[in-house]
Amino acid sequence: MSEASDPRGHIQLSGPDSRKFLQGQVTCDMDLLTPEQSIKGAQCTPKGRIIFLFEASCDSQDNIILETHSSITEIAIASLKKYAVFFKTQITDISGQVATEKVTDLQRLRTGAADITAETSELFIPQMINLDALGYISFKKGCYTGQEVVARAHYRGAVKRRMHHLKIHASRLPEPGSEILNSEGKAIGHIASAAQADEASVEVLAVLADKSSDCTEIGVDGQTVSVTHLKLPYEIPTGP
């Protein structure tokens, strides 16, 4: 069985206002970014839904490169440009010009970090896919688009869905964004990421309603499958 590797896209922001612009747009604190230290974050809609995820790096001239899933690159650029009109920053697609380490879908999934793809853009708020546990969110920085929703979920404990690592006994790979049903046919969540584990099983990161997080059987993509719960490599926060 061949292991699929997730394709990466790259967006460059150059110009004197690039860092200031991103600071008002993304969940992480861009002031912590240095040429020696990358940083991970998300851009959200005003309603707190994730548009795309990224890992940011910069050079000594403060050109900033955002690495993201290739399927979301065009969406990410369009979203950034919508807010960049009053800033001196140039946003460019440089995909294919940056060398990156090859990571398989399964390797990435087993870190407990989901990708946001074209299919799942604007489907989740950050805490639903555990970005607070993964260090993608600064709760100390200033305002950014969607902050009110993200902060409310954090300080009021309003997160009713969380991402879980499941092994499902099926040979067919579910698509990201696929709806998950319980044994009664009721929607209880969505697939965030999926990867083939072996010929008879698939591992997924699934966002599930809290009351259904102990499910042992689910319906997804027209098939009913048994579920084994696997441990995430980090603890999910239980409070602010």
Question: Language-model segments: what does each one mean?
Answer:
Residues 26-31, 81-85, 181-183:
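Short, solvent-exposed amphipathic alpha-helical segments in soluble enzyme
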Residues 2-5, 9-12, 55-112:
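Acidic, low-complexity central loop/insert segments
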Residues 9, 39, 62, 87, ...:
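A generic structural signal for short beta-strands and their flanking turns/coil linkers
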Residues 15, 66, 146, 185:
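Residue-level signal for inorganic ion chemistry
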Residues 50, 129-137, 151-240:
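Glycine-rich, small/acidic residue-mixed loop/short-helix segments
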Residues 21-22, 76-79, 162:
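Hydrophobic side chains in well-ordered alpha-helices
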Residues 102-167:
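Anionic-ligand-binding alpha/beta catalytic cores of soluble enzymes and soluble regulatory domains
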